[in-house]
Regions:
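A short, N-terminal "cap"/entry segment at the start of jelly-roll beta-barrel domains
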Residues: 2-92
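Double-stranded beta-helix
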Residues: 80-81, 87, 106-108, 114-116, 140-187
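A short beta-loop-beta micro-motif enriched in histidine and acidic residues
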Residues: 87-101, 116-117, 124
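Short, conserved beta-strand element in jelly-roll/cupin
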Residues: 95-112, 130
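Short, solvent-exposed loop/turn segments at secondary-structure junctions
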Residues: 111-112, 119-121, 138-139
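Conserved metal-binding segment of the jelly-roll/cupin
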Residues: 123-143, 153
């Protein structure tokens, strides 16, 4: 299924179709984020200073548009390069030097964040989750339609993080230090 999704994405990029920037901005809903800070659990380092940030129902998805394309346009316009369509692995893992943003394009899932001693959070179509480098994540269950996650991973952390999670009257001032290449550590 993900091969088909990625093929569709490639064709749309070549022929120049997809949601317009205006349609993408209309889809964004201002939401107050929920945050969680996880401690090192001995296996998963998590991030000692930056919280996981979860925006519920942050993107209005319509049946007329490819929901994954809306997330791709939104994330790429905010500095998150290299988007891809995939799911969350069913084993605990983390990215030691790269922040990640997840856009749930369809379906619903239960995801454990923060390692085995972390927290299981339900995510649904339209949700956005920002994971700072080191944050463990694992798919526990997903709906039959295969909760479609759009997971851009980038090495341009600071501008992207600030633009994704800033809102009227508030701004997270994060100062991450990381190398320029993505890295995934499986537990």
């Amino acid at each position: 299924m993900y091969m088909i999704e990625n093929l569709k994405k490639a064709v749309k990029q070549v022929i120049g179709t997809g949601p317009s920037p205006a349609a993408t901005q209309v889809a964004v809903r201002r939401r107050k984020p929920q945050t969680a800070l996880f401690k090192d659990d001995g296996t998963v380092p998590n991030n000692p200073t930056l919280p996981l940030v979860h925006y519920r129902n942050a993107v209005r998805l319509t049946n007329s548009e490819d929901p994954a394309a809306i997330f791709e346009r939104l994330f790429e316009s905010n500095g998150w390069k290299g988007t891809w369509r995939d799911g969350i692995y069913d084993y605990m893992h983390y990215h030691s030097n790269t922040h990640e943003v997840l856009g749930i394009a369809r379906g619903e899932a239960r995801v454990r964040f923060g390692g085995d001693k972390g927290k299981v959070i339900a995510v649904n179509a339209g949700d956005v989750v920002v994971l700072p480098a080191g944050t463990g994540h694992q798919r526990i269950s997903a709906s039959r339609d295969g909760a479609g996650f759009i997971r851009p991973c980038t090495s341009k952390q600071l501008p992207a993080l600030q633009s994704v999670i800033s809102g009227p009257g508030r701004s997270f001032r994060w100062s991450p230090r990381a190398s320029s290449s993505a890295h995934c550590d499986r537990i």
